[in-house]
Regions:
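Conserved alpha/beta-hydrolase
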Residues: 54-75
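Conserved alpha/beta-hydrolase "acid-adjacent" motif
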Residues: 198-204
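Catalytic histidine-centered segment of alpha/beta-hydrolase-like enzymes
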Residues: 225-236
Length: 250
């Protein structure tokens, strides 16, 4: 159900199995279901896009948004998906203890981490993947292209950008391949992509959808849409309505 109550925002930290401190915010509005928002690279829980999105989702669910390692108020260095699944484990454990249903929404590299988690665990009720890559190696050369980097610069927030810390050595590690891991996920899954995404081209969405073994799956291509959180920023209420409508289906 929808509520007009403004969410109370509570800050917290959890410790990962490899001793990284992960910062998170809980938007509490007395719902018994929760949405977890998993951001991509160069985003944080306090970036304008995700704080606004969390407020909007909190009309329908409680919301948890975290900073992956090397981002925002979390410690450690970002490893481009190599270790970030450890960041989300204690967040989901917290959610399972406190809510009737847990939904996970991953954006860009956050969707890669979400696929990695859900392929190995069965304690998430529904999964939404926004601008998910089939394979990290298929996107890394697109990130610094003008079409990709200019929209990122438009969202420039000094405090956020200067908080990012990453491990260059992690780029050499074996990376997660969602196209393989999606075959282990049976829960309801929604795949969302932008028609004009300059980083993760729309064919990634189609390939992941086709490879999915979920009996309850749907793929949505947003006309003229761009990348990840931009799909929300370009049409906030439409994006929220799309997600809420799908999550509320039995």
């Amino acid at each position: 159900f929808q509520t007009s109550i403004r969410a109370e925002v509570l800050e917290g930290h959890v410790q990962t199995s490899d001793n990284v401190s992960i910062a998170y915010d809980v938007y509490k509005a007395s719902h018994d279901e929760v949405v977890i928002l998993a951001h991509g690279w160069f985003m944080t829980k306090n970036s304008n896009a995700f704080s606004q999105m969390a407020e909007d989702f909190s009309k329908y669910y409680d919301v948890i948004v975290l900073d992956f390692r090397g981002h925002g108020k979390s410690s450690g260095k970002y490893t481009f998906g190599s270790k970030e699944v450890e960041d989300i484990k204690p967040i989901i454990n917290y959610a399972k203890r406190n809510y009737k249903k847990v939904y996970l929404i991953g954006f860009s590299l956050g969707s890669l981490i979400s696929v990695d988690y859900c392929s190995k665990n069965n304690n998430v009720d529904k999964l939404i993947l926004v601008s998910a890559p089939t394979d990290f190696d298929k996107i890394e050369n697109n990130v610094l292209s003008p079409n990709a980097f200019v929209p990122t610069l438009r969202k420039f927030e000094y405090k956020r950008w200067t908080s990012i810390r990453f491990s260059l050595s992690a780029l050499k590690r074996n990376k997660i391949k969602p196209i393989n891991e999606i075959k282990n996920i049976k829960i309801p899954t929604l795949f969302i992509a932008g028609e004009n995404d300059p980083i993760i081209y729309k064919w990634h969405n189609s390939m992941l959808y086709d490879a999915s073994i979920s009996e309850n799956k749907q793929a949505i291509l947003i006309k003229k849409g761009k990348h990840a959180e931009d799909l929300y920023l370009e049409a906030p209420q439409t994006f929220i309505d799309t997600c809420v409508s799908w999550l509320n289906k039995s």
